[in-house]
């Protein structure tokens, strides 16, 4: 879970709860059997829970048998009803609990009748985590039953369920217990129906030690009593109707560090007592964002339940970025605490971004909840959408409308562009592995991008009207996608919003995007003599250009032209439902056209050679900003991806990208950094050509460097400072000498006591260590150890791997796995990534370290799989691959599943070498010729046939449809080879 290792790590990972699964892992998960046996039967349903917990930390009270340190006792009472007749077994969840007693009763008159079947033992049945309860008589419809159980569990350290953490304040080391229940870990705290569809109300009681602060939970404390054993018992107000995964409680010595002191709209920030005013920014933004969501949805937050308040808490060890527990939002410290002097702009916007995401969940996820995780996008897609566009209304300075494209949409497209990608709605999600895998970039970022596209299709007002209808209709309930589609269709009908698109409904349109994986490449061929523009859609695949699973989408079409440029009107001119479409441009002669204005749709665009030449000419002109910044960003990203797949040669791609020499805007450069980083990785084994490529990149940075400079200036805008942070990190990495000199000098000044502006520290730290000594690293590491600001510690941790000193690298690696708490468990992954990937020379050094420390790494991380995968996928020579393979073979019996991980990583490294061998000539031709203006004369403006470098074997078998399938049909016939060749041949040049 990384925060700032280059731009790619900025893009969309941090707001997920739990941590999203990388798309590469999805391919492995998708091969697993999705076992519906993991789902609870729906024969009974809960109405209300009363839960009492008593946690024990490092001291066990005398006189209580069987207790161990870091454990808890619990009692739960669950009121349930059968949903059908003749139910003899109740099934709910439990995991890692010892059931001490359990009985099922019902009230008859003034007494309770026990119907628990005799002769049964109550255990948490694995792997399903089921607690089965047989009854002596069948349950009767319309009768309420009561399950009462006592149990015992352990406060684990794995950051799941009810777990323990610690921190250091003025008094020393403090223990605490907190929770993370999503997606299925409430069952580790108490027996329950641990699926989102089983909503109920909850009364929570916590019996804490007297010297702890008052317990924090979803609701305010209703009653406090002192028990005979001296403990304090705190009972909270009843929750709204909610799912188990949204419950939370914190037993700690926390204090309120920021408070709005508004009894009508209470909002507080909780944290350890030595963080000062670091909660003020999250409080300020939280209040504004909560009010903005209330206005957006027309549903006031504080009226959702009686006594509802809003609290946010900073957790030292937290597996997720943040969690949307109703009334108690929990965060990693680095993602909620902010120091204006010492936290950089990345964290300023990150705090706002994540607070917005979690607050949006109060409506999308809490008030209305996805019925099951197969439609998680109903929760997370809306929250990701809101965290950008709602935050943009509250604080426009943060630039979220611009940043959504490179940070979310383009990242989602990358993840969505492999054949193993999953659909937003995936009915095969049942088992825990599949559920965890569905917390993915596709679910979050693609979900948000499709919602953004839908808003442009309907208009803002109609879209909001539909969302309000959806929320009102499903409040305190669960939802399926058709509930959303129906509400949006009703709003569209009321506003006549789809009248221009004959036969289009939101239901039919949205299903092509939610039930189908992938997205289209829209290939545009312009006949400049006649003005006819031919559009062809086909599913995009990033490695070959052609998916093995063709499909059709309902594509909202927007476009503009040079003679009358209009990038502001994002209402689609038509919705393309078939394989092809012809549009009359309305003019004749050469002029550029650009489709998908401001990237308002979720699709890529390729053009014929002449049109690409005209676009390139426009981008290199003084009037390039006539083309919207987001469209320029789209062009950069599309060109990189078209070239990667082989649909476009790198010679042509670099010809187009040569315009970056004149570009200085934020979004195009973030797209360029991402694209260049992918290519640089594949040049890493070839020092001479890598140097040439890096020199080309440095040459392209003239305009952006001239605007940004290497130092922060007084009065600079937020977006300028943020862009400088990203651009300088990138340019120092590719060897820009002025950047390196500035970084080294600032690092030296810092060692001598000078202050470095927070927005410069990531690249200054990294550059200073990369070109520094062991003494520099030791000074840096000692400063890291004593640093108390959590997000500054993360910045330093992720720069530490930039050292090229071998002894310093080993010191860093040993610190990660030493168990001495210098690196917290939640930061192990990002720290290892920094150590292995920040310098190519570190890869084999890290491998040598791994081979000598397998046992210690396994004790700390659970296995060597993660670091081994990172190492083996970055090998640069056949000699390195042979060395690693030899070690894998020799240790196959002891490293288990990590063996296959290593073999697959070597295959990735070998594929990188082969890719370079296959494509290097295209780069060399551009290095030789430089930019070429290849627009043909007006006399030959018909799009010329393009050469192709893709052989027919690239394509799937021909499947010729007997009849034309209906748009949106689940049985869309595969495109023929001829159609695909036409699509790809538009711009495949040697």
From Swiss-Prot:
The family assignment reads: Belongs to the peptidase M1 family.
- Sites binding substrate sit at 321-325
Q: How does it sit in the membrane?
A: Lipid-anchor; GPI-anchor
Site (Transition state stabilizer) residue list: 444
Q: Name one GO cellular component term.
A: cytoplasm
The protein's role, per its UniProt record: Binds to the B.thuringiensis toxin, CryIA(C).
Q: Subcellular location, in the record's words?
A: Cell membrane
List of glycosylated residues = 295, 609, 623, 752
This protein's source sits in the domain of life called: Eukaryota
Q: Which range is the signal sequence, renumbered to this chain?
A: 1-15
Where Zn(2+) is bound, by residue?
357, 361, 380
GO terms assigned for molecular function: metalloaminopeptidase activity; peptide binding; zinc ion binding
Tell me which PROSITE patterns the record gives: ZINC_PROTEASE
Q: What EC number(s) would the UniProt record show?
A: 3.4.11.-
Annotated propeptide span(s): 16-35, 969-990
| Broad EC category | hydrolase
Lipid moiety-binding residues (GPI-anchor amidated glycine): 968
Q: Which residues form the active site?
A: 358
| Any one GO biological process | proteolysis
Q: What protein name applies here?
A: Membrane alanyl aminopeptidase
Tissue expression summary: Midgut brush-border membrane.
What does the note under cofactor report? Answer: Binds 1 zinc ion per subunit.
The disulfides recorded in the entry are: none
